[in-house]
Every structure is written in structure tokens, then in C-alpha cells.
């Protein structure tokens, strides 16, 4: 099973040390009581991957690992078979020793939209809420972060992260924990907190904003990326049964409304940094994610609308500070 001892040792002497009052018992209970029916199959694939240490590692312009001399075709095929056992791959892409994992999302494009607007990450302790496979954690490390911690209750994503970590030489600067933010104590210990692609899945979005705030140090920075609609500060879409075929979408505010929500929750220096329509080039079906994707979620005759008739996905990045 997954061993979290390295993470416990890492945080024992820093501002995250109070987390050790609750975290080990939480994760022990998770391993005993909450494992997904396929978890052993997924983790078996991770265990059968080779432990590789790249001679060239680029986390600044992507997540790329190479080795000189290169691994053999047979090794690459074995590695690919194990990684394919962890499909679907949604967040990436990853370039590993000549193998290209072409994920559903071009998460590197989102990173390019976010990065110019945020405070430098060098030396920072970071929390990424809803981190998925951990792609952005590695990009944060590429920007010089001291420690990047991701939380996501989806257990396949944890196994994907551990697979990538193993192929990057067992790097201990990034960690993923199988938790939701509601399971975290109020740590007030992270310099930057990211919540990207999460808010619209929350039944109580203001509670989510308070939960994010409670993880930040004083003067810490929130990076919030989420679906929005066009409109003024009073505009909020509450979809019916589904939005873009997703059942669990509750509130999609306009960017000005979201700014007002953040200010209502006590954040300051709130700014709308970026807005971008999601395209079928950024989110699409691939060889590593073979089920339906954005093209099937949009009106086939009018890509400005979802199949349900709502405005097509528009995403905003907002930056805010905890005073």
C-alpha cells in the first residue's frame, strides 16, 4: 500500500507540523476502510513500473524526463503497458523517456494562462485543491516551490501521481493525499493555495472559499480558476440536471459575481486575471482518454452552447490575498 511516512517526516519540523495531530490516523483509516475496488489493480501497475532517475528533467517548460543512454524499446513498452492500466489520463501531458502521455486536458495551456499573474512560487509551500494526477504540482516545483501538496479524493489520480513520481526518480518535493478540503484542519500554513476546476462542483461555494482562506498564511495568495458566465455582479447560472453532461455542477457565477463572493469572504486585492473559452483543442478525446470529451458536450450545431443549451464553458482566473 501507499506509504505516507516520507511526507510525515517532511512536514514534522515546519509550519505544517500541526497536521500530524490528525493526518496519520486519517490516512490509516482511509487505507483500512475506503479503498476503491480497483485500487489494488491500479497500485499493482505502479509497483511494476521501473524506478527511473532521469539524466534530464524539465519541470519548467513541461513535465519531461529523459535518460542517456535512452531506455530500450522493450522497457518503454513495459512502462507504457503499466501506465495504460491507469487510464483514463485526464490532466497532463507528460513526456517520459520517449513516451508521450497525451491527456484529455492540455493542462499546460491552463498553466500558461495562470502563471504570469501569480506571485513567484520560489521557496513557497503550496496547496493544490483538486489536483488530479498532480501535473500542476510538478510545474509548481519547476517554478522553484519548496513543497507542493495536492489533495484529491479520486484514488486513480493518486496512483497516477505515484506512477509519475516513480518515473521522475522518486522526487519528494511534491505529494498527493487522498483527501477533500473539508477533511483538512484550519492549517493557515500555505503561502499559495490553488483551487482550479473545483468551485462549480461545490454545493456551497462560499464555504469552499472560506475553506481555502483557512489554509492560507496571512498575506497568502489564492489562485482560483473556475467556470464562469458572462454578466454583471448579480449574474449566477444554476444549471438543472446537467451542465455539459456533468451532473455535479451547482453554481456558475459571472467573474464580477465571483469577485464579490471573494470580497464577502474577506479576501482583499481581488482581481480577475484571465478569461478564456475552453476549446476542443484544449479538452478532447485522446488515445489515453478514449471516452466522450468536450466535443460531445457541446451543441453540435452551435459550439457557443452546451448540449443542454447553456453557455459553453468559459473559464476565469481570479487572484486574491488573505489579509
Curated annotation (Swiss-Prot):
Enzyme Commission designation: 2.5.1.-
Domain of life, source organism: Bacteria
Keywords: Transferase, tRNA processing
InterPro entries: CmoB, Mo5U34_MeTrfas-like, SAM-dependent_MTases_sf
Reaction equation(s) it catalyzes: carboxy-S-adenosyl-L-methionine + 5-hydroxyuridine(34) in tRNA = 5-carboxymethoxyuridine(34) in tRNA + S-adenosyl-L-homocysteine + H(+)
GO molecular function, one term: methyltransferase activity
GO biological process, any: tRNA wobble uridine modification
The family this protein is said to belong to: Belongs to the class I-like SAM-binding methyltransferase superfamily. CmoB family.
UniProt subunit comment: Homotetramer.
Role, per record: Catalyzes carboxymethyl transfer from carboxy-S-adenosyl-L-methionine (Cx-SAM) to 5-hydroxyuridine (ho5U) to form 5-carboxymethoxyuridine (cmo5U) at position 34 in tRNAs.
Protein name (database record): tRNA U34 carboxymethyltransferase
Lineage: Bacteria, Pseudomonadati, Pseudomonadota, Gammaproteobacteria, Enterobacterales
Designated gene of the protein: cmoB
